């Protein structure tokens, strides 16, 4: 197992959750959510995060239907990942993110009740869960 740092993204049309993780420990932490305008992020905000955290790899969650089929948002998330690669030259991988938002809400509610459920927190924790699931899949 290497000691690469990995940045995870929970793509959405209004907000994109971001988390950072370490392969060596298999852990991740939420960073923040970046506002998006109909799915288009503020690329300057993403560039700042990439410069600050210097990830070796990017993981983008794919919002699939429960039966595993793709939907419109899945195509848009894939396009977002391809643009990340094109703009910043970083390796991008994709991870099935079914139910991560539900799990993120449950995790946050356990910690702080309804007041902990703001959109930015949910998106950040969703990105964290995507990263943790990706690392678990890679290294068991």
UniProtKB/Swiss-Prot annotation:
It is found in: Cytoplasm. GO terms for cellular component: cytosol. InterPro entries: RNaseH-like_sf, YqgF, YqgF/RNaseH-like_dom, YqgF/RNaseH-like_dom_sf. CDD domains: YqgF. Keywords: Cytoplasm, Hydrolase, Nuclease, Ribosome biogenesis. Belongs to the YqgF nuclease family. Gene3D superfamilies: YqgF/RNase H-like domain. The keyword Hydrolase applies. Could be a nuclease involved in processing of the 5'-end of pre-16S rRNA. Its EC number is 3.1.-.-. This is Putative pre-16S rRNA nuclease. One of its GO terms (molecular function) is nuclease activity. GO terms for biological process: rRNA 5'-end processing. NCBIfam families: RNAse_H_YqgF. Coiled coil: none annotated. It comes from the Bacteria.
């Amino acid at each position: 197992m290497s000691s690469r740092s990995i940045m995870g993204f929970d793509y959405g049309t209004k907000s994109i959750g971001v988390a950072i993780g370490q392969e060596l420990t298999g852990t991740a932490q939420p960073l923040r959510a970046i506002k998006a305008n109909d799915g288009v992020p503020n690329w300057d905000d993403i560039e700042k995060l990439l410069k600050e955290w210097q990830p070796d790899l990017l993981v983008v969650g794919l919002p699939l239907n429960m039966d595993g089929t793709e939907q419109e948002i899945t195509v848009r998330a894939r396009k977002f990942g391809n643009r990340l690669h094109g703009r910043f030259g970083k390796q991008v991988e994709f991870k099935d993110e079914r139910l991560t938002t539900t799990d993120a809400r449950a995790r946050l509610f356990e910690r702080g009740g309804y007041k902990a459920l703001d959109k930015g927190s949910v998106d950040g924790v969703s990105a964290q869960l995507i990263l943790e699931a990706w690392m678990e899949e890679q290294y068991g």
